[in-house]
């Protein structure tokens, strides 16, 4: 069989605004009017082509599937504004009537594409023993030449134990299946053009009266060496059904090792910045390990033609830790100074900051004065300042007193539902 699916999402936005010279919005703006227009278009196209073949020979079932998938995301925008038009009734319909020295014009275009193809082979014997082997090749235009493509193989096997003769007489058992799988997955999720350095033109500047345009570096510095983040996952699970599946459960134990973690990293301020903001760069920054358990239990409490009542409980526990980083060193403030440090042996996006012990009080002025905010001991603490714990005991509160405070990753989650 052959199937082709084409889907698209499209959004159009347009905003027109006029603020008269005497309006509240223009108070303190030299009594001039403001006219502006902004419009944008966003589109997403997905085209999948799938061909499949299935064949049964006695107790043996074979299947093969091949597919291609193409996506394109596109965003365009344009905006223009001016100040000082003398006829309010023009509103935003005649931007050329504004003072030419006030013109601000901007536009943007962002586009990226992905292309994938995959092969999958299935085999089943009596629906009791099952094997699936597949491979997927993905390409992403956001990555640089030589790093755009990656391959993701996988293999999965299952054994429906409840179909074996030695369990046929266990009436309470409706289903029992053991599953084992291994596979690779990837992540190329960087911003469009994230591997390239660029410039942003500025025309709304003090030099505009003289017809000058200036440029600043983009916040993100290009890195052509960025490649796919790769994850290897082992999963061991079983499905069980009891009493004609009135009670069923799914349990999975997994371990995922990820290499070449793809994250934006805030660079040292010594390297400069853009618009008073430190530069950032996408990097394959290290490796992590995740392992955990997921359990889902479902019960059919009432099931008749007039009423049905199901209950579901899910529970998941996960341990995550960074196993390696660039140069083998922690990266403090990888994305922000407090909430996104990368610490070996800790989860991703850890909190690394001072321990807050409250506020220095008036009756603690003498004690507060023993602690200093700088290495030269010229600025001591005083009542009203935040009391930070001095971990190294040198009476100087500095970066050496920051410590691990936790992470954004929960140790466990659960959910209950009744329908």
Each predicted region: which residue ranges?
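Conserved small-residue
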Residues: 79, 283, 300-414
